[in-house]
């Protein structure tokens, strides 16, 4: 029995070891201090609600309170760090919550809401995963971040330029000649370049359309696989990453005038077993729903309403034109009309 309790406690602790942290947030978005766990699949809903968008299912999570509905943040910046359950963040300015059921997630729903509501204003939407060479830029992000390095070769070349982070970061046990170390450092370079490029276009951070940034960093995970989590390289990289994230959060928060939410997700590894696979052994074959009888198109339920409106309005207009034309054609002005008076006067003059 004691062994079972120990196993259950270890499973629960491992399931809640990951963290969801709020690095920066404006006064209009209220995050409460507490130890309330947040499901991994509801993180996009937290981002959507904090920006003032609606979600399909109500979020009964006490960590997010109702803020100022008329003053929403101009940007949401979410950074996902893989390979570590938590980082040594400063406890004073950061609010952290346990993350349960850490399943892979995306902010596509938030991006779609931004596109549908602010399509004419072309907001900045940037989703980037440097280690996978995955990038998604829409709106003004194409012009702002067109010089951003996104492929592994571009990232490597960017690191060896004069103004790269290699010249300012204390590498300690990390090496410039190791591909895994360079991958981690290149992700830090991406963080620096995003804030640097945005600082050249500060007017974009002051418009009325909200912006979205989603970054996924896997360099620390690769370092843990290469050297081990107890290695000096992993510890040095964790400290460097904390400092880089703090600086990145401060820069983005300052560029948006203190009206941005900067969020951090630290996950040891995503639990893909909780995600439904696209193909399973119980998958049924797709049935052909087309009818072989060449039936007519199934119209919308409102078709009869629209048809009757158009029919009777056109009928009324046609009758009005016919009646008006008939009355004008058969109109008798009478002998006292000016037409006849002018005619009689003309006759007398003749």
Curated annotation (Swiss-Prot):
Q: What does this protein do?
A: Multifunctional protein which functions as a renin, prorenin cellular receptor and is involved in the assembly of the lysosomal proton-transporting V-type ATPase (V-ATPase) and the acidification of the endo-lysosomal system. May mediate renin-dependent cellular responses by activating ERK1 and ERK2. By increasing the catalytic efficiency of renin in AGT/angiotensinogen conversion to angiotensin I, may also play a role in the renin-angiotensin system (RAS).
Identify the tissues in which this protein is expressed: Expressed in the brain.
Native source organism of the sequence = Rattus norvegicus
Organism domain of life: Eukaryota
List, in alphabetical order, the GO biological process terms annotated in this UniProt record: angiotensin maturation; central nervous system maturation; eye pigmentation; head morphogenesis; lysosomal lumen acidification; positive regulation of canonical Wnt signaling pathway; positive regulation of transforming growth factor beta1 production; positive regulation of Wnt signaling pathway
| Record's comment on post-translational modification | Phosphorylated. Proteolytically cleaved by a furin-like convertase in the trans-Golgi network to generate N- and C-terminal fragments.
Q: What is this protein called?
A: Renin receptor
Q: Which GO terms describe its cellular component?
A: apical plasma membrane; autophagosome membrane; axon; cell body; clathrin-coated vesicle membrane; dendritic spine membrane; endoplasmic reticulum membrane; endosome membrane
The answer on whether this UniProt entry bears the keyword Transmembrane helix reads yes
Zinc-finger among keywords: no
Q: Where is this motif: Mediates retrograde transport to the ER?
A: 346-350
Query: Which stretches are annotated as coiled coil?
Result: none
Q: List locations, semicolon-separated.
A: Endoplasmic reticulum membrane; Lysosome membrane; Cytoplasmic vesicle, Autophagosome membrane; Cell projection, Dendritic spine membrane
Main location (coarse class) = endoplasmic reticulum
Q: Where does the secretion signal sit in this chain?
A: 1-17
Q: Where are the transmembrane segments?
A: 303-323
């Amino acid at each position: 029995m004691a062994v079972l309790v120990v196993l259950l406690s270890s499973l629960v602790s491992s399931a809640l070891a990951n963290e969801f942290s709020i690095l920066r947030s404006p006064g209009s978005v209220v995050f409460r201090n507490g130890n309330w766990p947040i499901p991994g699949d509801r993180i996009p809903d937290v981002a959507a609600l904090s920006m003032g968008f609606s979600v399909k299912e109500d979020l009964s999570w006490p960590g997010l309170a109702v803020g100022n509905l008329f003053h929403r943040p101009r940007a949401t910046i979410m950074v996902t760090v893989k390979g570590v359950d938590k980082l040594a963040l400063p406890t004073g300015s950061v609010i952290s919550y346990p993350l349960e059921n850490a399943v892979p997630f995306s902010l596509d729903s938030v991006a779609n809401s931004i596109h549908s509501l602010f399509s004419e204003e072309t907001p900045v939407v940037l989703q980037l995963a440097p280690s996978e060479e995955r990038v998604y830029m829409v709106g003004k992000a194409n012009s702002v971040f067109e010089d951003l390095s996104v492929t592994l070769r571009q990232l490597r070349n960017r690191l060896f330029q004069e103004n790269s982070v290699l010249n300012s970061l204390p590498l300690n046990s990390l090496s410039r000649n190791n591909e895994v170390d360079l991958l981690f450092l290149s992700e830090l370079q991406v963080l620096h370049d995003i804030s640097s490029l945005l600082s050249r276009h500060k007017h974009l951070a002051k418009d009325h359309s909200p912006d979205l940034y989603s970054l996924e960093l896997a360099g620390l995970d690769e370092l843990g696989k290469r050297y081990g989590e107890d290695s000096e390289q992993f510890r040095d990289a964790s400290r460097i990453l904390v400092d880089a994230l703090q600086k990145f959060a401060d820069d983005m928060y300052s560029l948006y005038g203190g009206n941005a939410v900067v969020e951090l997700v630290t996950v040891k590894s995503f639990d893909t077993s909780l995600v439904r696979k696209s193909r399973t052994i119980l998958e049924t074959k797709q049935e052909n729903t087309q009818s072989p009888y060449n039936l007519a198109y199934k119209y919308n339920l409102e078709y009869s309403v629209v048809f009757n409106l158009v029919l009777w309005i056109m009928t009324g207009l046609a009758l009005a034109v016919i009646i008006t034309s008939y009355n004008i054609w058969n109109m008798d002005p009478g002998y006292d009309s000016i037409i006849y008076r002018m005619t009689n006067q003309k006759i007398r003059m003749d």
